[in-house]
């Protein structure tokens, strides 16, 4: 079945040569080095210390097990050519809460159920449906998770002498202030030094992985100066040198029903982040992932991680991006990344005991900053009030209540607002391409029909009819990928788009970026008042340029002709204004 055929097999069928392997080898090793401190940090942040001791497990080792097993399975079975799987920051909040309340058995149960839910989502072809989750909801809970991750690292970053960190956000900060006097100067200095190293290398030498440099440098300093700083060895006793023998996890059937909402949240987070990562990768390599195949791979990856004592996994956007930038072209790079981590465990695991926890806290603080999406957050706040409200509600619920509640309430609220807006607007249709033989637009009674105009070769004209909401945003991407070759000029008619939301604007921004990569000039025609105001408030007008937006199709076609070096043509005498501001020019 082509829909579920892994990209790894498809690549091998097409032919895999030495040049591709060399690129994948370099990328895989590079990503493995970058993933090393992240995997350990995610494991430490996800499992409470008391739970780890009671279950006899090592949190940093659990992170590495997940990166190796899930990372290999995602690449081997996935629907994306360059996706890198493993533990991510998005899971820290939900995993920590489950482990703290239900113990390791509860976490294994929830992760296993989440794996089967992901398999079911993929088999039932829910890959396209998950893309309809509105952008403000995703940004809201992602930014909320970032705040929680940052706040959870204060204890290790400053070396505070306190017991278990409270799970509640407010209680957590109360505890920090109560124990602020116990901060440890060497620990804080190591944490600040690690954070500064990561930030400065990212700013001035982004090709060098700042996290691994910070980890190596701080480990050497702490060891040589014999500083009183907690390390992986002092708290967890080191890391095993090999993977454990796969075994049936301590699944609790009694807890299964109670943990079903948490398992569903893990599955939804894994699905959303993995498909977002795949979309980002598509934009970088010009490909197209198989969403349903990717969900099936994520399901097997989470099931496999549980059998090796791991934690939930998904596609990692940062590592996937690093893979592409390092030259990765095929799933082989992801499998090499997993093997690289396995070799580290076999050869260098004794040295991992010297890694300071303050440095890993600094690594996670940078992860939190990257997850915060502050620019997108601000942009949505300037979007229509309904989108801003959904964003703030999802963000607030994530930080102050529970991630499971936040995702559910955010999706329901966005759906209700969407249905209300759709009910208020008539004449809604889908994205359509105008051709001379299109019955709906070739009627003689339509004076602005495309068949009345001469469209030059090298110019494509598409039209969006109806409100451009999150439910329609993904369709424009599908239309783009059906084009055999990029045109010189792409005209997008928006005369029938009366309303656009933040997800629609985000889709247009990605569309514009793709056009720029393809050497295509994007022109918008017939932009109404509400979309124009939304463009201006969100900054899209500055991105595309006001010179590329026109009140009617005829002006846009003449601009396209000028781009192609062709003479302009007069508009048909029967043409009528398409938008209100165009009436003065007719």
Where in this protein do the model-derived segments appear?
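Short secondary-structure capping/turn micro-motifs that flank functional sites
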Residues: 339, 531-532, 551
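Generic hydrophobic alpha-helical segments
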Residues: 95, 173-176, 476-480, 556, ...
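Conserved SAM-binding loop
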Residues: 84, 524, 549
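Short acidic-hydrophobic, aromatic-tinged amphipathic segments that line or gate anion-handling sites
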Residues: 543-559
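Intrinsically disordered or compositionally simple regulatory linkers and C-terminal tails
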Residues: 1, 560-586
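Transmembrane helical cores of multi-pass ion-transport proteins
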Residues: 1-439, 472, 519
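The feature marks cytosolic C-terminal regulatory regions of anion transporters and related permeases
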Residues: 370-543, 561-567, 585-586
């Amino acid at each position: 079945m082509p829909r579920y055929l892994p990209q790894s097999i498809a690549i091998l069928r097409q032919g895999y040569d030495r040049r591709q392997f060399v690129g994948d080898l370099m990328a895989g090793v590079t990503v493995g080095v970058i993933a090393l401190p992240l995997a350990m940090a995610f494991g430490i942040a996800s499992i409470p210390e008391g739970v780890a001791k009671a279950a006899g497990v090592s949190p940093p080792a659990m992170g590495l097990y997940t990166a190796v097993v899930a990372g290999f399975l995602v690449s081997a079975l996935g629907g994306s050519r360059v996706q890198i799987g493993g533990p991510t920051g998005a899971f820290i909040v939900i995993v920590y809460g489950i482990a703290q309340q239900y113990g390791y058995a509860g976490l294994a149960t929830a992760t296993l159920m989440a794996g089967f839910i992901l398999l079911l989502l993929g088999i039932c072809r829910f890959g396209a449906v998950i893309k309809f989750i509105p952008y403000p909801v995703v940004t809201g809970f992602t930014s909320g998770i970032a705040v929680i991750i940052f706040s959870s690292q204060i204890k290790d970053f400053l070396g505070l002498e306190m017991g278990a960190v409270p799970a509640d956000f407010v209680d957590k900060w109360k505890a920090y202030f109560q124990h602020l006097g116990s901060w440890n100067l060497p620990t804080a200095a190591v944490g600040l030094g690690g954070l500064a190293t990561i930030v400065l290398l990212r700013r001035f030498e982004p090709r060098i992985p700042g996290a691994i440099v910070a980890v190596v440098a701080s480990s050497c300093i702490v060891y040589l100066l014999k500083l009183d700083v907690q390390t992986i060895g002092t708290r967890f006793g080191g890391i095993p040198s090999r993977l454990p023998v796969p075994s049936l996890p301590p699944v609790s059937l009694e807890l299964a029903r109670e943990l079903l909402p948490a398992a569903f949240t893990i599955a939804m987070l894994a699905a959303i982040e993995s498909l977002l990562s795949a979309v980002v990768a598509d934009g970088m390599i010009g490909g197209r992932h198989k969403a349903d195949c990717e969900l099936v791979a994520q399901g097997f990856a989470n099931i496999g991680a549980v059998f090796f004592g791991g934690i939930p996994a998904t596609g990692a956007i940062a590592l996937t991006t690093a893979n592409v930038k390092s030259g990765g072209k095929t799933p082989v790079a992801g499998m090499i990344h997993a093997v690289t981590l396995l070799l580290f465990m076999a050869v260098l695991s004794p040295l991992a005991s010297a890694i300071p926890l303050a440095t890993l806290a600094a690594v996670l603080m940078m992860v939190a900053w990257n997850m915060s999406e502050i620019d997108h957050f601000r942009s949505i706040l300037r979007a229509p009030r309904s989108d801003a409200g959904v964003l703030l509600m999802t963000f607030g619920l994530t930080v102050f209540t529970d991630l499971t509640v936040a995702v559910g309430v955010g999706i329901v609220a966005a759906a209700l607002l969407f249905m209300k807006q759709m009910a208020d607007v008539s004449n809604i249709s889908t994205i359509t391409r105008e051709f001379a033989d299109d019955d709906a637009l070739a009627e003689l009674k339509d004076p602005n029909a495309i068949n009345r105009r001469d469209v030059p070769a090298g110019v494509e004209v598409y039209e969006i009819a109806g409100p451009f909401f999150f439910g329609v945003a993904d369709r424009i991407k599908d239309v783009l990928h059906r084009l055999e070759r990029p045109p010189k000029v792409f005209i997008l008619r928006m005369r029938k788009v009366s309303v656009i939301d933040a997800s629609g604007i985000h889709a247009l921004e990605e569309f514009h970026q793709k056009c720029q990569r393809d050497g295509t000039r994007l022109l918008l025609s017939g932009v109404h008042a509400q979309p124009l105001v939304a463009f201006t408030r969100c900054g899209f007008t500055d991105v595309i340029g006001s010179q590329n937006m026109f009140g009617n199709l005829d002006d846009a076609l003449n601009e396209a002709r000028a781009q192609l070096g062709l003479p302009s043509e007069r508009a048909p005498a029967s043409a009528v204004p398409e938008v209100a501001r165009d009436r003065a020019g007719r």
